[in-house]
């Protein structure tokens, strides 16, 4: 006869699988033994054992981000669970579905000085969409139904709009080793199946769609702003809507609008450089902005929207309240793709295209041409990495971009292309931690994958490289090594020379070759762009882990960025004369 621990753990795990979980990331530990062994015995789950908890959590986040469905994450009790915290925060803000299962001591061992027992109740606070402290294992039918139901609820809550992490705290008494065989699965499935959930996406009633379309079509100077958003079908729908409304689209690199076979007539990729030119920025102020997704990375765009509060900003979001400019006039709580399709049902072709739209597209063409013309052809420049990768990556590849300078350079130098590419990043809390692990997690589902990352961020997550070795993953990592925090050289702190290097520049003078080799990777340092192209091409064709270290100068990087922005401003000013 099956014991309570075995059937209860099996019911919980089978409930996760029946609700749609197919991958689980596990951190080793004793108290989580019932969950880990039940998962290992389940035929519908693929497991990834990641030793470092912080890395494991970001790995699960990257996997869930790329798969766009919940991933289970399991650890033992104590500080192991606390180490999941940074990834849980990122998952919450970037709306990634995670089911975090933390094993715990039984109730009688809590708050009495027992070893490896911390207060895990609501450990992640408001960053968990839902929390449950499970009952201790019992073998009664109702308790097995309870375990399966809690598992199904956790998965469906994580996947519901807006997606995010949930926390399931699971206490277990010793002995901890379950005995799971076919009889256990039969017992679990004889009791009940996990509840089936039919989940829809929010849509507006037709009268609201009609009213919104009237407001948009009446605008003489309209813009669509698309921030980070990864929704199948959205690119085709929003570009069709842009054409119908004659609204240019300011497309963040994470909007998935810059790359692909969809119509890009209205997709603008150089607005960040345009809005740095004050005359152009003042002349291009719209009447209305229809905004999709999270706030774009561009600071000039953010400040421009914040400064011109007369702009009617309509924020489309399927949940939450993303208005960092505090300037939104209206919120539309709807699925983005559905809303575009609904608006298109009301759309009537415009007989006369506006000069406003044409001016924006002309400015974008001028800015992009100036950037491309003045990019250095021979010397190292970090922005060139993105123009090179746009050519080198095969159709269908994924580009994972690190925070700080890399994502900003992607915004400026990752130009629109007809090649299908998927661009990913951790832009929820925007931290530089966990990026290697996130990218390797994403590489499970998005391959080939190239990560572009700075040296401090790479150092932060060196442990993450172990996942590539343990799971035989392929990834190309372009390491931009300017020996410190390059973004600070663009900030006011750079004017304080005395303490700048100590407090902000933080040079580490690290050699990464041995660390990469320790984790079974290949490390190369190209000396020119021809070698860079060769290394990337070889890495993409051969597979495995390959770190291509591009050594740059922070001072030269700042000089070149400012030169390029000045050239764009000069060309635009000349056009506006």
UniProtKB/Swiss-Prot annotation:
Which EC number(s) does UniProt give?
Answer: 2.2.1.9
Q: Which InterPro entries match?
A: DHS-like_NAD/FAD-binding_dom, MenaQ_synth_MenD, MenD_middle, THDP-binding, Thiamin_PyroP_enz_TPP-bd_dom, TPP_enzyme_TPP-bd
**Entry keyword set:** Magnesium, Manganese, Menaquinone biosynthesis, Metal-binding, Thiamine pyrophosphate, Transferase
Q: Which reaction does it catalyse?
A: isochorismate + 2-oxoglutarate + H(+) = 5-enolpyruvoyl-6-hydroxy-2-succinyl-cyclohex-3-ene-1-carboxylate + CO2
Record note on cofactor: Binds 1 thiamine pyrophosphate per subunit.
Give the cofactors, semicolon-separated.
Answer: Mg(2+); Mn(2+); thiamine diphosphate
Is the keyword Ribosomal protein in the record?
no
The pathway is: Quinol/quinone metabolism; 1,4-dihydroxy-2-naphthoate biosynthesis; 1,4-dihydroxy-2-naphthoate from chorismate: step 2/7; Quinol/quinone metabolism; menaquinone biosynthesis
Spell out where the chain crosses the membrane: none
GO process annotations (BP):
menaquinone biosynthetic process
Q: Which Pfam families match?
A: TPP_enzyme_C, TPP_enzyme_M_2, TPP_enzyme_N
Entry keyword annotation includes Methyltransferase: no
Q: Which GO terms describe its molecular function?
A: 2-succinyl-5-enolpyruvyl-6-hydroxy-3-cyclohexene-1-carboxylic-acid synthase activity; magnesium ion binding; manganese ion binding; thiamine pyrophosphate binding
| Family listed | Belongs to the TPP enzyme family. MenD subfamily.
Output the NCBIfam families linked to this UniProt entry: menD
Job of this protein: Catalyzes the thiamine diphosphate-dependent decarboxylation of 2-oxoglutarate and the subsequent addition of the resulting succinic semialdehyde-thiamine pyrophosphate anion to isochorismate to yield 2-succinyl-5-enolpyruvyl-6-hydroxy-3-cyclohexene-1-carboxylate (SEPHCHC).
What is the protein's quaternary organization?
Homodimer.
Its name, as the record gives it, is: 2-succinyl-5-enolpyruvyl-6-hydroxy-3-cyclohexene-1-carboxylate synthase
Q: Identify the coding gene.
A: menD
């Amino acid at each position: 006869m099956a014991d309570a621990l075995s059937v209860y753990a099996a019911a919980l795990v089978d409930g996760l699988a029946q609700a749609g979980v197919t991958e689980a990331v596990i951190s080793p530990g004793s108290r989580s033994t019932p969950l880990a062994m039940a998962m290992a015995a389940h035929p519908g789950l693929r497991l990834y054992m990641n030793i470092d908890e912080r890395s494991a959590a970001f790995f699960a986040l990257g996997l869930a981000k790329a798969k766009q469905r919940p991933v289970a994450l399991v650890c033992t009790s104590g500080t192991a669970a606390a180490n999941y915290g940074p990834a849980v925060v990122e998952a919450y803000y970037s709306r990634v579905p995670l089911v975090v299962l933390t094993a715990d001591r039984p109730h009688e061992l809590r708050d009495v000085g027992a070893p490896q027992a911390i207060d895990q109740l609501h450990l992640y606070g408001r960053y968990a969409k839902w929390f449950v402290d499970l009952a201790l294992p019992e073998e009664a039918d109702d308790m097995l139904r309870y375990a399966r139901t809690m598992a199904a609820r956790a998965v469906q809550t994580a996947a519901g709009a807006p997606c995010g992490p949930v926390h399931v705290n699971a206490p277990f008494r010793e002995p901890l080793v379950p005995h799971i065989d076919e009889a256990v699965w039969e017992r679990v499935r004889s009791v009940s199946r996990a509840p089936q959930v039919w989940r829809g996406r929010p849509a507006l009633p037709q009268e609201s769609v009609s009213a919104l379309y009237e407001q948009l079509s009446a605008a003489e100077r309209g813009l669509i702003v698309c921030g980070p958003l990864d929704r199948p079908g959205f690119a085709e729908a929003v570009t069709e809507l842009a054409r119908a409304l004659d609204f240019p689209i300011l497309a963040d690199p994470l909007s998935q609008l810059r790359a692909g076979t969809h119509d890009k007539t209205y997709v603008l990729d150089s607005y960040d450089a345009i809005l740095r030119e004050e005359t152009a920025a003042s002349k291009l102020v719209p009447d209305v902005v229809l905004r999709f997704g999270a706030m774009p990375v561009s600071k000039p765009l953010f400040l421009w929207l914040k400064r011109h509060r007369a702009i009617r900003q309509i924020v489309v979001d399927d949940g939450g309240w993303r208005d960092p400019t505090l300037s939104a006039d209206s919120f539309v709580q709807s699925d983005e793709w559905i809303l575009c399709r609904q608006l298109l049902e009301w759309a009537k072709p415009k007989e006369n295209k506006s000069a406003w739209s044409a001016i924006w597209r002309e400015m974008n063409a001028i800015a992009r041409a100036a950037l491309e013309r003045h990019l250095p052809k021979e010397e190292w420049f970090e922005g060139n990495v993105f123009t090179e990768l746009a050519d080198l990556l095969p159709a269908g590849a994924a580009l994972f971009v690190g925070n700080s300078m890399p994502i900003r350079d992607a915004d400026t130098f990752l130009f629109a292309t007809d090649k299908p590419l998927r661009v990913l990043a951790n832009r929820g809390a925007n931290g530089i931690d966990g990026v290697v692990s996130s990218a390797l997690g994403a590489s499970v589902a998005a391959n080939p994958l190239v990560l572009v990352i700075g040296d401090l961020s790479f150092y932060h997550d060196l442990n993450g490289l172990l996942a590539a070795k343990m799971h035989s993953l392929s990834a190309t990592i372009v390491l931009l090594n300017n020996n410190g925090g390059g973004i600070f050289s663009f900030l006011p702190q750079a004017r304080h020379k005395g303490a700048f290097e100590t407090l902000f520049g933080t040079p580490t003078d690290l050699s990464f070759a041995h660390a990469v080799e320790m984790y079974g990777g290949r490390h190369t340092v190209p000396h020119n762009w021809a070698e860079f192209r060769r290394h990337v091409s070889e890495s993409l064709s051969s597979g495995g882990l390959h770190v291509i270290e591009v050594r740059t100068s922070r001072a030269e990087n700042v000089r070149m960025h400012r030169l390029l922005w000045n050239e764009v401003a000069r060309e635009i000013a000349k056009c506006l004369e």
